[in-house]
Amino acid sequence: MKPTDTPRSLRPSVPARAVTIAVLVIVLAYMLGPVYWLIVSSTKSNSDLLTTSGWWFSGRNSFSTNYSALMSWTQGLFWRWILNSLLYSSVAGVLGTLLSVAAGYGLAKFEFAGRGAVQVVILSGLLMPIALLTIPLYLVLDAVHLTNTVWSIILPCSVSPFGVFLGRVYADSSVPNEIIDSARIDGASEVRIFFTIVLRLLAPAMVTIFLFIFVATWNNFFLPLMTINSAELKPVTLGLYSMSTYFNPQYGALLQGALLGVIPLIVLFLGLQRFWQSGLAAGAVKG
């Protein structure tokens, strides 16, 4: 038996593997079903959406017609909304990742008075619904005259209690104390240690935190709804919502816009999949 072979007694039985595969197939269908339905629906007109099956294409392909209607209804602003969402999500993701890793590293590696209380406050933030904070955030942003600006989305979304929690877990498991102590003995400052050593060790974990913040910012709806009035500053989620409020909207065009709005997220996850998976594993075992 090779060293990497699993002992026969530990191997799952054939029925167990069959049940596992069946469950995974069901979960896969559950996850991909809405995306498939969105692809099919984006090729249909309003009448076809009401008269044909939602799980198969109709005889007429209205994809190009829906795209023209999408551009017409949005007055050419649809791709501007996509770029806005990319801007908000990318900047908030980068800032939020740095803040989360810095805070998590500080909580994991530094002893200071009140550290336990700070961790309790951060964990409490995980239990609080985001929608509950929307109105207080609006009042704060309005008081400092940041409403209807890009910062009204970027700044709140850059603060992530879940990101800080992940940063602490990853820093505690992936940054050895011996390396930090050696750098201090060599005369390195805490800032230099963080930027030259800690960030490199936590690079895979940072990708995971970035993806969580990026997706959360991209999907954020209530905050832009409260703080953004200008059509040129809307993210794609708010822009598509404004389309749905029109009288007799073109649902095929609306669904096509939703499909195009999902593509950047799919590309991002596929492109960063290797780093994301290694980042999830990084916090699983304490080194």
Question: Can you name each region flagged by the protein language model?
Answer:
Residues 16-287:
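A structural signal for multi-pass alpha-helical bundles of membrane permease subunits
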Residues 1-13:
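Short, Lys/Arg-rich, polar N-terminal cytosolic tail immediately upstream
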